[in-house]
Amino acid sequence: MADIIARLREDGIQKRVIQEGRGELPDFQDGTKATFHYRTLHSDDEGTVLDDSRARGKPMELIIGKKFKLPVWETIVCTMREGEIAQFLCDIKHVVLYPLVAKSLRNIAVGKDPLEGQRHCCGVAQMREHSSLGHADLDALQQNPQPLIFHMEMLKVESPGTYQQDPWAMTDEEKAKAVPLIHQEGNRLYREGHVKEAAAKYYDAIACLKNLQMKEQPGSPEWIQLDQQITPLLLNYCQCKLVVEEYYEVLDHCSSILNKYDDNVKAYFKRGKAHAAVWNAQEAQADFAKVLELDPALAPVVSRELRALEARIRQKDEEDKARFRGIFSH
């Protein structure tokens, strides 16, 4: 450990171990996944916190050898054992890019595209983007770089091949190969009744394809091919959302599909069920009518859904009448 700390110090990194880790130091070969919590602090007397992964509720996951935009994190992570807590004071040369990396991580934490604002910008927009990161603290740090302290807690170290990569960590080739496997895993989870977990798998597969699609010209054969792969996954995702009664999300996604593919029977059927669930009776009937028009063989299924809708409407009418009678009887 003394040798490691000495080498870090020569490179402008001061390590202070707060809690010793468990076992031997992993070899951290390329492809190793490190999961850790981090807190970034100013190195001045106040020690103001810039970012804290615990406050966001999810630890950081770093794949060694993937050329992460902040190389110093890979350097310091590779000196840690599982369970270790340590602080690293890093010279300016190591943290110049931190504001840009922090912006991407903050975007990810709130569900935004990590590259938001960095692609397809006109000249004026790019100038504005370069002048501001959208966060006052990051703007100040970018304009006046200073050493930073990283407080790190190593939660888990996984060797290559022992874990499934998150979509954001994959190469384009890895994403394309992973989609069918993630799709199958989602189907298995759904069959076993793990609906929320299945939805998460479908979401991951969609994220992979969306990321690939963003690199293609909209409307091009490649873009359309990817979109046609996304559609069945999105329908599976909608089925999960129907089961967990998140109907408005189903309405949004099915409508987006039908705006592009107005002959998609499954999208009409799922949207019809969602409309029925939120008492949009006319819209539900219209969608079910469209299902029959496109595929008359589904008449028994549609009839069952319409009977269920009519029964719910009658029950609701009776409940409303009883409620009003109660109001006016006082």
Curated annotation (Swiss-Prot):
Pfam families: PPIase_AIP. The modification Phosphoserine is found at residue 43. GO terms for molecular function: aryl hydrocarbon receptor binding; GAF domain binding; peptidyl-prolyl cis-trans isomerase activity; transcription coactivator activity; unfolded protein binding. InterPro entries: AIP/AIPL1/TTC9, PPIase_AIP, PPIase_dom_sf, PPIase_FKBP_dom, TPR-like_helical_dom_sf, TPR_rpt. One of its GO terms (biological process) is protein maturation. Widely expressed. Higher levels seen in the heart, placenta and skeletal muscle. Not expressed in the liver. Changing residue 304 to Q: In PITA1; ACTH-secreting pituitary adenoma. Residues 31-121 form the PPIase FKBP-type domain. TPR repeats lie at residues 179-212, 231-264, 265-298. GO terms for cellular component: aryl hydrocarbon receptor complex; cytoplasm; cytosol; membrane; nucleoplasm. SUPFAM superfamilies: FKBP-like (SSF54534), TPR-like (SSF48452). It comes from the Eukaryota. It is linked to Pituitary adenoma 1, multiple types: A form of pituitary adenoma, a neoplasm of the pituitary gland and one of the most common neuroendocrine tumors. Pituitary adenomas are clinically classified as functional and non-functional tumors, and manifest with a variety of features, including local invasion of surrounding structures and excessive hormone secretion. May play a positive role in AHR-mediated (aromatic hydrocarbon receptor) signaling, possibly by influencing its receptivity for ligand and/or its nuclear targeting. Interacts with RET in the pituitary gland; this interaction prevents the formation of the AIP-survivin complex. This is AH receptor-interacting protein. It comes from Homo sapiens (Human). The lineage of its organism: Eukaryota, Metazoa, Chordata, Craniata, Vertebrata.
